[in-house]
Amino acid sequence: MTRSFADRHIGPDAAELSRILEVVGVDSLDALAAAALPASILDDAGAGPLAALPPAVSEHEALAELAALAQSNTVTTSMIGLGYYDTLTPPVLVRNLLENPAWYTAYTPYQPEISQGRLEALLNFQTMVSDLTGMEVANASMLDEATAAAEAMTLLRRAGRSRSNRLLIDADLFPQTRTVLHTRAEPLGIEIVEADLAAAGLPEGGFFGVIVQVPGASGRVVDWTALIAAAHERGALVAAGADLLAMTLIVPPGEQGADVCFGTTQRFGVPMGFGGPHAGYLAVRSAHARQLPGRLVGVSKDADGNPAYRLALQTREQHIRREKATSNICTAQVLLAIVAAMYACYHGADGLRAIARRVHGHAARIAGALGEALVHDTYFDTVLARVPGHAEAVVAKAAACGITLRLVDPDHVAVACDEATTDAHVEAVLDAFGVAPAEPVDAGIATRTSEFLTHPAFTRYRTETAMLRYLRSLSDKDIALDRSMIPLGSCTMKLNATAEMEPITWPGFAKLHPYAPVEHAPGLLKLIGDLESWLAEITGYDAVSLQPNAGSQGEYAGLLAIRRYHLDRGDTHRDTCLIPSSAHGTNAASAAMAGLRVEVVKCRENGDVDLDDLRAKITDHAERLACIMITYPSTHGVYEHEIAELCALVHDAGGQVYVDGANLNALVGLARPGRFGGDVSHLNLHKTFCIPHGGGGPGVGPVAVRAHLAQYLPGDPLESGSHAVSAARYGSASILPITWAYIRMMGAEGLRKATLTAIASANYLARRLDEYFPVLYTGENGMVAHECILDLRELTKRTGVTVDDVAKRLADYGFHAPTMSFPVAGTLMVEPTESENLAELDEFVAAMIAIRAEIDQVGAGVWPAEDNPLRGAPHTAECLVGEWTHPYSREIAVYPRGLGHARAKVWPAVRRIDGAYGDRNLVCSCPPLEAYAE
């Protein structure tokens, strides 16, 4: 029998599924759906919500269709610039990092002991950024340059002394950056003033911050030292956008006095990809480190005193501070940040300088030939030419040679050089302008003299052999899906199939500039159109935008749509967002960013939203009610049977219903939020639809809406007032083929079966583990959704063993831990997904049962509460060969199920890490080698 793609994506075969359903207590998947989901929202299994999807095809057929789409695109030599440049990705990084499941299937490193490899790689990224910008602390990536600028704006406001609501931005910022800044500023009451700051200086009046860019959109390089000093004298802080390649030659903003730097690392080996994904960055002075949004890797020490990496200052994050968080950013761009970091490690400081000099040299040749047509005589890679009335003709002549220039206006053309620019390209550009070659023009820029990238990480791995082994040594320290299931609740760590991943590096997708003429991208635009219609069909909504490049940004875009809808109707008073106490912290943070007040709705003891409290809150805020944000199924892992009534209550009060799509893997093919009461949802393509998590990004968070909100979806970032939320119109377009391939190969029947299998597997684990770790919440008929919460609180009270102990001990058993203490402290949330077979589920069950037996040993006094296999976990190979004073044996420590157990052994790189020490002694760049010798 020929196996379909769905048969290979879904872990349990027919016999295993029969066993799973037997334990769950139902005789079929349809019976499971009827028992678990409310009948009021369940779609008919025959017609189903997926009937309009195309029938499933094989992997080879899907790849052939994708190849045809890619080949229909026109790949030219892009010299458009504006923050997107062609780059030469070293093949060693393509094969061993970008295309390696040991890297792209990992999750965010919340379990640092089994994440030391990518944490070290991210520390390299932070060091690279802080060195090149001249700043002191950088975070572990942002979503793109424009959103990084927006985060810089709010950081300036939080960290500064000024009480003004005015922000000054230089008119030479990238246009997409200006648009996103305006989108973010308006709901927060920030007034943006644009001016040519280089020419006019600072205007009169108060302002809390200034944002400039080096080089500017026109290519102009300005020394901002005097303006920064003047801004500081007036109580304002300054953020500067900085091109990292340019910073190898130009005095960086940090040395000019800037307080914050932001930008993108795209040109460090990451293809343009029609807009993304790329790792943005944000760097600050040490005084502002605790104001940084996103994730920050720091150096701490483990139980044996060895240096160890971890995520630092996590109390800043939205999971804890909710609407008071520094940002709503959760998933960022870890995989792409690591590519950029390894690009810097591979080339080193001298290699990057050489690339920068070559790029600048090509620009200087063009500038010299342009003569008096050159607009700015200070530049790095981009020159602006004044050609009155002839701009379109110049661009057309270059296009005939396969080169795409930037048409600025009828009188001006910009030309951006990059790593891939050749002498032949320069000659073709000069021919398009109708000018003869001439001597290069001195760009007149202040040359950098300070050193950078001096840490051995940037000098040791300059040969392919060294880099290959370095990447392997790092990935060996981590647990990703290539080694084990990752049962993280609310994260949906399912298979990222090779056939889905293969097209992302094809030139027809990877080498397109996001602002290229639309006629260059018919294949990708067809793919995007397919996805928009398929996702609308799956969710029951009427329109979809793929622009948001993370779930957090999809949330934000959806809430902005609701806000603008109310404002257009004259309901300016509707500014209150109701959020259940069980909600993901991102919800509250997104609401605050959208200018909404957050009011928390209580949950009942069974985990459901308390409708009585909801009615009371609606009454209390009737005139001000904007919306409710509800996750469905809930973050408590159950299908709330009163969801339709909840939606009706809010609608009757004039509010909108935002259904968080984080748990859509429990709905696809069964129920549609747009049909059971939702007005808007965001989806997570990196959860439900197979884009890999990449160790913390990339993600894609499309926003789907009913027809009345469609006009409020984000628009083209090159158009002012478009309410764009990302730098590129289609966000992280180059990874959309992954989701397209998944839906195309699964078909309607496969998608529905995947959902039901995920639900069946979660209920199987709940049934098997309930007597050892009580399942905290169940819905009607005792069912859970696609995840379940295991309650350890009574065990902790009785024995002192915590969820942290259990999470660390699971590493000794070869597993990544489930989600800890969310949404309820002292619990573990488990989500197996549809991709794990019965053998893997049973291995996890056996590990958890064995851990329960160890907990009982502690409770019985056999092992002391402070010295037992759980409190000592995880155990490294190094600790085995040292002095052993523990009351349990070495074998129990590292082979808890016996030496003969067949499961591959995972050796954590470090012992348990001291988080508090790392936060008290914050170090966020590569430590000196002496730290490892102490």
Curated annotation (Swiss-Prot):
Its EC number is 1.4.4.2. GO terms for biological process: glycine decarboxylation via glycine cleavage system. This is Glycine dehydrogenase (decarboxylating). GO terms for molecular function: glycine binding; glycine dehydrogenase (decarboxylating) activity; pyridoxal phosphate binding. It comes from Nocardia farcinica (strain IFM 10152). Pfam families: GcvP2_C (PF21478), GDC-P (PF02347). Belongs to the GcvP family. The modification N6-(pyridoxal phosphate)lysine is found at residue 687. The gene is gcvP. Keywords: Oxidoreductase, Pyridoxal phosphate. The glycine cleavage system catalyzes the degradation of glycine. The P protein binds the alpha-amino group of glycine through its pyridoxal phosphate cofactor; CO(2) is released and the remaining methylamine moiety is then transferred to the lipoamide cofactor of the H protein. GO terms for cellular component: cytosol; glycine cleavage complex. It catalyses: N(6)-[(R)-lipoyl]-L-lysyl-[glycine-cleavage complex H protein] + glycine + H(+) = N(6)-[(R)-S(8)-aminomethyldihydrolipoyl]-L-lysyl-[glycine-cleavage complex H protein] + CO2. InterPro entries: GcvP, GDC-P_C, GDC-P_N, GDC_P, PyrdxlP-dep_Trfase, PyrdxlP-dep_Trfase_major, PyrdxlP-dep_Trfase_small. The glycine cleavage system is composed of four proteins: P, T, L and H. Its cofactor is pyridoxal 5'-phosphate. It is an enzyme of class 1 (oxidoreductase). Gene3D superfamilies: Aspartate Aminotransferase, domain 1, Type I PLP-dependent aspartate aminotransferase-like (Major domain).
